[in-house]
């Protein structure tokens, strides 16, 4: 009773120090609730008070309430308070523990909480040391079967082994035996360290034993023993959720591919467990590969080992970074490389890459006046529809396989478009030559097609030379008016050449500076370039006789 009074007095003495030292409710408050020191209603009340006034005030109120409880609750509080995780979390509790009286023992049993007495008739009798399970007897009898005379050694009879779970003996009895060879005595056991996440229900590090069991057929079957459970590759595949493909390149490819922690066994072998999950395994399609397909141990791209992802359609394996595009994480379910996907597409659609037959041109009737300039020059000749005028047919042609390059243009041919003098006569570009004599001296520029020419070469009969609006021989018979503001001049090739008329009557107004500036501002350079190409694509007119 003196100890109970001392613990209560120490709690009242260090109440404020403990409240200040505890700066968070976890893990102390939760541990008190787990050990039934604080009831659920008081636990929730302390959490609400912590949110309102802070953690120190909430714990001070909790300790004040604890002083009103019995001595057993106070003793349990001190035990929980001085646990290792609380001392690590709350550093200010260490001085309180150091100043704790040495004569106060916190390890004394609880009072008033003794377990109920069990009648002696219900207590099971102690197990006799000579009573063993069938698995232990099989292991003890194994040396007797392998001795030359078949007599059991006395040491094997006296050696007792720890009991194992009944499941282990049942599993061993299912395994076939033959020719007096005991399963467990002839097995080769190799210890492999595995993580607890690889085996369902395991906590902490477990020890797996890779057992190669010998059967009468001379073959072998690999399984992993964890505690008393034996896991075969079929068990891993049934219990595992997803199909894991990441693996290490050392050693042969195992029956089970796992992505979890891997431990190399002595002798170069590996033990791999299927990773457990909640998603059910996908059903195997007829085209899916075998589950025991052997993949390569090196990347098919860089020919290096390491963490690889295995293709389900071929034996190749790849690094995630070597794929194109690279993957950041291992995809779930069935995964195939690009070669397998391409082969599958070719099988489903063998003629997908064949060129489609060219469709005949579709002819659409249009009212007069809506045909674009130069349409007859660009479009190939075709048969018109029956009973329809050829001038009212607009042909929709399919796109050609490849666009033909534009004809090369001399920069001097386009330069006069941007160099118009103040008098309306275009300035001469360096290197401009007459198309008849080839001389570049005193050449003129046609105001319609911008071609360089000599007046004497194009008009040798002595036709009078006008002051403005000079045109070459080809454009002198063109009745199309010169381009005005906002309108591009149509191609002269569409119009049939007519007889020469009076210069004053046949010549249209020249392209003045204001018209050209308006044309450049309202139309793109592509339109001007197209107009220049159409103007220069006409054949030269014959010389007058």
From Swiss-Prot:
Keyword Zinc assigned: yes
Effect of residue 304 to A: Strongly reduces interaction with histone H3
Function: Transcription factor playing an essential role to promote self-tolerance in the thymus by regulating the expression of a wide array of self-antigens that have the commonality of being tissue-restricted in their expression pattern in the periphery, called tissue restricted antigens (TRA). Binds to G-doublets in an A/T-rich environment; the preferred motif is a tandem repeat of 5'-ATTGGTTA-3' combined with a 5'-TTATTA-3' box. Binds to nucleosomes.
Disease: Autoimmune polyendocrine syndrome 1, with or without reversible metaphyseal dysplasia: A rare disease characterized by the combination of chronic mucocutaneous candidiasis, hypoparathyroidism and Addison disease. Symptoms of mucocutaneous candidiasis manifest first, followed by hypotension or fatigue occurring as a result of Addison disease. APS1 is associated with other autoimmune disorders including diabetes mellitus, vitiligo, alopecia, hepatitis, pernicious anemia and primary hypothyroidism.
Main subcellular localisation: nucleus
Motif (LXXLL motif 2) on chain: 63-67
Composition-biased stretches (Pro residues): 116-128, 358-368
Species for this entry: Homo sapiens
Motif LXXLL motif 1: chain residues: 7-11
Result when mutating residue 252 to L: In APS1; benign; does not affect transcriptional transactivation activity
Protein name as it appears in the record: Autoimmune regulator
Outcome of swapping residue 228 to W: In APS1; changes the subcellular localization and in addition disrupts the transactivating capacity of the wild-type AIRE; acts with a dominant negative effect by binding to the wild-type AIRE thus preventing the protein from forming the complexes needed for transactivation
InterPro entries: AIRE, AIRE_PHD2, HSR_dom, SAND-like_dom_sf, SAND_dom, Sp110/Sp140/Sp140L-like, Zinc_finger_PHD-type_CS, Znf_FYVE_PHD
Free-text note regarding domains: The L-X-X-L-L repeats may be implicated in binding to nuclear receptors. The HSR domain is required for localization on tubular structures (N-terminal part) and for homodimerization.
Domain named SAND: residues: 181-280
Motif LXXLL motif 4: positions: 516-520
